[in-house]
Amino acid sequence: MNHYIDHTLLLANATTKQINTLCDEAHEHQFFSVCINPDFVEHCAERLNTSNVKICTVIGFPLGANTTAVKVFETQNAISLGADEIDMVVNISDVLDGKWDVIEKEIVAIKEACGPKLLKVIFETCLLTNEQIVKLCNISKRAGADFVKTSTGFSTGGATVEHIKLMRDTVGKQMGVKASGGVRTKETAQAMIDAGASRVGASASVSIVTGEAPTTNGY
């Protein structure tokens, strides 16, 4: 299970000491990546430069309400600092307003900025209908994104087995599906993987892989 996990710390009050611990835990447990806010990308890339742990960061986070130009710049800047993977929040207002062409153009622009780097599109599934989730999956696939992702972990809910199944059924085997938000136990993580998740974002990653109860609340 370890290699499914993006070991995550996205809190506003995260300290460098906590980020160092995150990196060291990811290295020790061989998690797929660390997922951190953009300001820590360069630091994590340097700390993990002799490991296989990837550097994942978030764009337009957590509301998705930045303009496309800002998201493109964020993406380019993060990659220049050492990011391997980009988790971008879709504009939820545009989804609710049905501005599908605008959404698709934004994803295309950000994927172009990513180049060969991997792009995940965050939906915030707790705010959407199943129909909207399916529509976003199809748009993300057509726009060239590599993954679809459930949640930021900062809204009214996180990943559910039902949404993971729906997303996997929609995108097929050609794309990744990331479960994030509220995945805090080994049993929950395994349920997400069994439902079709190819990546799991979690702050309780060490507890998940050791089977121990998480000691704090988090992503």
UniProtKB/Swiss-Prot annotation:
Organism from which the protein derives: Vibrio vulnificus (strain YJ016)
Known pathway: Carbohydrate degradation; 2-deoxy-D-ribose 1-phosphate degradation; D-glyceraldehyde 3-phosphate and acetaldehyde from 2-deoxy-alpha-D-ribose 1-phosphate: step 2/2
Alphabetized NCBIfam families for the sequence: deoC (TIGR00126)
InterPro entries: Aldolase_TIM, DeoC, DeoC/FbaB/LacD_aldolase, DeoC_typeI
Database matches in Pfam families: DeoC
Main location: cytoplasm
Protein's cellular compartments: Cytoplasm
Top-level taxon of the source organism: Bacteria
Function: Catalyzes a reversible aldol reaction between acetaldehyde and D-glyceraldehyde 3-phosphate to generate 2-deoxy-D-ribose 5-phosphate.
Keyword terms: Cytoplasm, Lyase, Schiff base
Name of the encoding gene: deoC1
Protein name: Deoxyribose-phosphate aldolase 1
Active site: 87, 149, 178
Record family assignment: Belongs to the DeoC/FbaB aldolase family. DeoC type 1 subfamily.
Record carries keyword Ribonucleoprotein: no
GO cellular component, one term: cytoplasm
GO BP, one annotated term: carbohydrate catabolic process
Listed EC numbers: 4.1.2.4
The reaction(s) this protein catalyses: 2-deoxy-D-ribose 5-phosphate = D-glyceraldehyde 3-phosphate + acetaldehyde
One GO MF term attached to the UniProt entry: deoxyribose-phosphate aldolase activity
